[in-house]
């Protein structure tokens, strides 16, 4: 299940299996590739590339912004991850490109934090949130460039933000909330 998958994707031993490769492409069964651009994405040299998580306009409303700020102050500690933390980040893991040496180094450096993720449940502790939020030294593509790699959450908004251009691929295309778009 999801716990086993998260455990594997946060395991140094998993990435060591690919030590003779520069990158690995994670392409889950609910991902789709539209164009042959993998080599181009590898050439950019990023540590991690995944679909960006867009911040919808509703979160810019003053009352909502105030609520999110208060939520951070009341419930967020230094290591506490809240759902709002992923807004504007690059990181969905279902279709993602990962630099093997960087993943191995992060699994070593953040081993304690990875174990915390493995022990906790909930979407904010899925492995892709770890990769998007924990390794601060990782080189990620800017949000706008990541739109050219993949869409996952809110594909209609991503398509608009990408000025009507489809990405290299997508993830989660058959989810109920996404299927009408795809």
Role assignments for model-derived ranges:
Residues 1-22:
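Active-site-proximal specificity loops/subdomain of glycosyltransferases
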Residues 1-5, 56-57, 150-154:
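A short acidic, often aromatic-flanked loop/helix-cap motif at beta-alpha or helix-coil junctions
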Residues 13, 40, 48, 102, ...:
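Alpha-helical elements of Rossmann-like donor-binding domains used by nucleotide-donor carbohydrate transfer enzymes
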Residues 21-34:
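Short beta-strand-to-loop acidic/aromatic patch adjacent to the donor-nucleotide binding site
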Residues 77-182:
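Catalytic core and acceptor-binding pocket of nucleotide-sugar-dependent glycosyltransferases
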């Amino acid at each position: 299940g999801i716990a086993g998958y998260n455990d594997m994707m946060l395991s140094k031993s998993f990435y060591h299996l690919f030590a003779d490769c520069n990158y690995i492409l994670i392409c889950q069964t609910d991902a789709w590739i539209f164009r042959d651009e993998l080599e181009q994405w590898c050439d950019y040299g990023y540590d991690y590339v995944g679909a960006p998580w867009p911040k919808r306009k509703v979160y810019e409303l003053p009352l909502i912004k105030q609520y999110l700020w208060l939520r951070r102050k009341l419930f967020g500690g230094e290591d506490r991850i809240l759902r709002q933390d992923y807004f504007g980040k690059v990181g969905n893991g279902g279709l993602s490109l990962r630099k093997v040496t960087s993943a191995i180094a992060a699994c070593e450096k953040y081993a304690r934090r990875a174990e915390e993720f493995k022990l906790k449940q909930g979407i904010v502790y899925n492995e892709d949130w770890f990769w998007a939020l924990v390794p601060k030294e990782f080189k990620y593509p800017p949000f706008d460039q990541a739109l050219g790699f993949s869409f996952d959450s809110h594909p209609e908004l991503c398509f608009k933000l990408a000025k009507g251009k489809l990405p290299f691929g997508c993830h989660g295309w058959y989810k109920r909330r996404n299927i009408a778009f795809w």
